[in-house]
From Swiss-Prot:
Protein name: Chromosome partition protein MukE
Organismal lineage: Bacteria, Pseudomonadati, Pseudomonadota, Gammaproteobacteria, Pasteurellales
Pfam families per UniProt: MukE
Keyword Cell cycle: yes
Binding partners and assembly: Interacts, and probably forms a ternary complex, with MukF and MukB. The complex formation is stimulated by calcium or magnesium.
Biased composition (Acidic residues): 236-247
Any one Gene Ontology cellular component term annotated for this protein: cytoplasm
HAMAP family: MukE (MF_01802)
Function of the protein: Involved in chromosome condensation, segregation and cell cycle progression. May participate in facilitating chromosome segregation by condensation DNA from both sides of a centrally located replisome during cell division. Probably acts via its interaction with MukB and MukF.
Family, per entry: Belongs to the MukE family.
Superkingdom of source: Bacteria
Encoding gene (name): mukE
Subcellular location: Cytoplasm, Nucleoid
Amino acid sequence: MTDNIQDLLSIKLARAIANPLFPEVDSQLRSGKHIGQEYLDNYSFLADFQHELDSFYRRYNVELIRAPEGFFYLRPKATTLIARSVLSELEMLVGKVLCYLYLSPERLAQQGIFTVQEVHDELINLADETKLLKAINLRAGGSDLDKQKLAEKVRSAISRLRRLGMIHAVGDQHSGKFTISESVFRFGAEVRSGDDPLEAQLRLIREGEAATAQSLQEEKNGLKDNMDQSAVENEQYFENEENEGIA
């Protein structure tokens, strides 16, 4: 029996699983969380055992990915044995806006701190508000109630992205203030090209990939067909989590 276990587990993998940090890190990864260098202990643990843990997770048909920016996350395959879900189109668009803000001069000017309201305003500024409202409700006519629902959806999207490790709350949990993690580059694979990153991200947002019901479905179908080619749009599955507001 012992020999069989040793055949399945390398000594280093056994050490990784026996490490006190493993249960916490494993739970976070399975929930869809991205682990960057700001999580010092957990990040160091993953860096030390990256190869062994990747082999471990491949048994569940998922991969342990270390992005070019350095953060870790699990990328499910179509046959994954770990539960997954898809980010909504608005959540993905909010993620793109966060990536844009991360690259913007305002990030340095504001010491890296943004608010939920700023994200909402930037989203309206960069995208067509009418199309955004239609994306949430095809019958939306631009009423105050429609705009209120959009604001609530934006807050929910930010809250979910926070739970995925893409932003970090600052101060009181109800302050609505946060910093943006490098893991938002899951939404900006295209900006790794030779083009100016800020202009590339701005172009992506203005193209309105999540603008209308038809384009939303076309984008979703395209993402599924090219699952292995994009850092986010082709790897958009995350663990289901309950909605909760950050503001």
